[in-house]
Amino acid sequence: MVRGTLDIEAYREKVESAHNIIRKWAHNTPILNSSAINSIVGCEVYFKCENFQKIGAFKMRGAVNAVMSCGITQKEKGFVTHSSGNHAQAVALSSKFAKTNAYIVMPKGAPKIKINAVKGYGAQVYLCENNEASRVETCDNIIRETGANFIHPYDNEKVICGQATCAKEIFEELNEINVIMCPVGGGGLASGTIISTKLYSPKTEVI
């Protein structure tokens, strides 16, 4: 198997650009720690509290960067994505900020509170079957009908660079971080965290 190499330095300008956008539209969330947890684990542990982010999740960073970095013509076409919750809300709110349409494909089994939140941001919600093929097919149909721009929940460079700003803010506030522990779902946050770590704190280990 051939493994490609990533030119991390080529991402510096992209991450800086993403952060300039995100500063205008999302929160620099607080970094907190707990003396109780520190005593249990025997080291200093800090939490980057993205639960205080707009829509309550880090997904806002990637979505707002993907939307706001588009040109006027692209924005006018609107945006489409598929998601069961947080990315759906993030694209919906980002599209509202951009004063354009959002077409959000969500599985029928998605929590009603998240479906209602997406609708509350003014997006059009399309319910589909609870499988990947149905999500993709529904998005493709919307794109053909509207010409809207598709924003993948994690397999999108602008989304990844947006998520990278979370770790960037950590390195701007804290010194000499030994380890960052990052959750992995689709991999957008993990990819962004690795990029920022290589750029701003290469001695830090990402787990």
What is each model feature region?
Residues 1-207:
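PLP-dependent amino-acid enzyme catalytic core
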